[in-house]
Every structure is written in C-alpha cells, then in structure tokens.
Swiss-Prot record:
Organism: Streptococcus pneumoniae (strain CGSP14)
Cofactor note: Binds 2 magnesium or manganese ions per subunit.
Pathway listed: Cell wall biogenesis; peptidoglycan biosynthesis
Subcellular location: Cytoplasm
Keywords associated with the record: ATP-binding, Cell shape, Cell wall biogenesis/degradation, Cytoplasm, Ligase, Magnesium, Manganese, Metal-binding, Nucleotide-binding, Peptidoglycan synthesis
InterPro entries named among the record's database cross-references: ATP-grasp (IPR011761), ATP_grasp_subdomain_1 (IPR013815), D-Ala_lig_Van_CS (IPR000291), D_ala_D_ala (IPR005905), Dala_Dala_lig_C (IPR011095), Dala_Dala_lig_N (IPR011127), PreATP-grasp_dom_sf (IPR016185)
Occurrences of domain ATP-grasp (ranges): 131-333
Name of the protein in its database record: D-alanine--D-alanine ligase
Gene: ddl
Amino acid sequence: MKQTIILLYGGRSAEREVSVLSAESVMRAVDYDRFTVKTFFISQSGDFIKTQEFSHDPGQEDRLMTNETIDWDKKVAPSAIYEEGAVVFPVLHGPMGEDGSVQGFLEVLKMPYVGCNILSSSLAMDKITTKRVLESAGIAQVPYVAIVEGDDVTAKIAEVEEKLAYPVFTKPSNMGSSVGISKSENQEELRQALELAFRYDSRVLVEQGVNAREIEVGLLGNYDVKSTLPGEVVKDVAFYDYDAKYIDNKITMDIPAKISDDVVAVMRQNAETAFRAIGGLGLSRCDFFYTDKGEIFLNELNTMPGFTQWSMYPLLWDNMGISYPELIERLVDLAKESFDKREAHLI
C-alpha cells in the first residue's frame, strides 16, 4: 500500500511564493510507485484549501493552486488534512510556517511531519534567540545589537555606533528570505532601516557588516544528524536580498565551495553542533560567513530551507550522492522516526 504525503504549501508569510515553488518541485519529484500526494494550500488569509491529489506523475499542465487561482468552494477546516498513517510535508517558509505554529497544530492532530519540532522551529525562526543559544554553545557570531519595540531607539542607535561600525545590516528577528533587511552606511540610513524592519517584527537585529563569502551546509537526520560539504552562494548584487534570491536569478552556486579542508571541517562541525543545540530534527540549512580575515561566523539556521530542485539544500545533498527524490523519501522516513519517538515519550 502506498504511503500518503500531505503537502502543505502557501501560507501567510511574505515567503508564500517561495513555498509554492518548493511544493511544485516536491510534487513532481516524488516516487509515485511508493507515494500518493495530497495537497492543501494555505491562503494569505490563513484558510485551508483542499487542492489536487496525485497518484502518478503529474503532467506539465498540472499546476498547484495559488492565491491567484483559489477555488473557495474547496475551503475546508484545517483539521481536514488529517489522514491516519499519512506524513505531512509542510513546505512552508517563514512566520506561520516554520516558526513552530504549524508544527504544534500537527502534533495536536497526532500526525508525523517532516522537519524540526515546535521548539527548534520557533527558536531558529527568531534570529536574536538563535544567536543567544549558539553563543552558549560556543559558536562564533557576527557582532550584533538587539532592539525590541519599546526600547529607546536613540539610545540603541548610540549602542550600535559604540559597539559596531558602519556598514551594518538591520533585520527583523522573526523573518526569513531577506525580507525587511537593509544595509546602512550611516545613522540616517539606520533609522530608515529600523523603521522598515519594525514593520515586519517587534524585535530587530542590527549586525556588523562583514566582507565575507556566504557558505552553506546542509543537515539531514534526527539525533544522528549528518552534514554536507559546503556550497557557496556567488552573487551579482550587493547583498542576497529577496529579489535576487527568488525573482531575478542573479545568483549562482558553487558546490562544493572552494575552501580549505580545515575550514570545511570547522563549518561542518559547527553546523552539526548548532543543529543539536536547538534540538533540530529532519533537516536544516546552516549559513555561514567566511570573512576575508579568515573568520568563520554562523549566520543562521533555516529549518525549512528553499526546497525547489534548484535550491541550495537539495543540490548540496545531490553532491553527496543523494538525489532529490531520494532526499524526499529520507525526510519522510525521518518524520515517522521522530513521530514514533515523540509518541513513546508521552506514555
């Protein structure tokens, strides 16, 4: 009997378009001799829409539903995704997707799901909290200042100017895919950057700008996590912003990255240590800065990285000999393994 995968995609965050691309890729890559795929679209308003089911390879004309093509007659209660024995693959990015909220919902439904649990998802989604946890694990971070809504902004800007040097990068703490991130060269630009970042979150991170290569490591596993050789993001723009990342295709990837064996070893070890520090499960992508001074800074952990067939995470594993369809199978198996362990702990 075939295993059912429930594919959740879309979502309420600014990254919903990325989610659709990832879900389409998964839907086309699945081994339909082993799996049946049922898809549910989460609209921008948070409604669940029952969309297509696939028991064999979809045709080129098959497209997943989006906000532009919603059939509201197919709206269902969120709990309608439940199917005994099915595994949920929440291909959701950003807030209300990989921040622990959907993971908590799926645990209430008592369904296995791909990826990190409530704790590790919510922790990794918040950049400030992640930095504090990784600091406690002894992992080097880019110098930063945290600013929370209600803080004296003028005093915080003074702290930034005391501890850091321009240029600095300002980021919403709880957002991904470079949404709301700005580079500032002076105080006036920093004030504008803070205003933008606070539109997306009530907690904001200001980081020291560094001249660095962006190196990424893939992680796969539960308590026996394994890492990939690193890959490098090669950019044609000033920084890896949302448009460059997903719309303009102004980036290329160098896999494996051209760095020394010693640097590779440190990055892989730090990535695995970070994954364990947050209690990660299933998958993550760990992003590093490798500065022109030879410093290695862990930038962030993405618990549901971009998952199209041309995204960095699947390509990193392809370089390690695990194909995209096989990667999906492994993630489903890991989801069932972590579900069984979680259920056993409740007895």
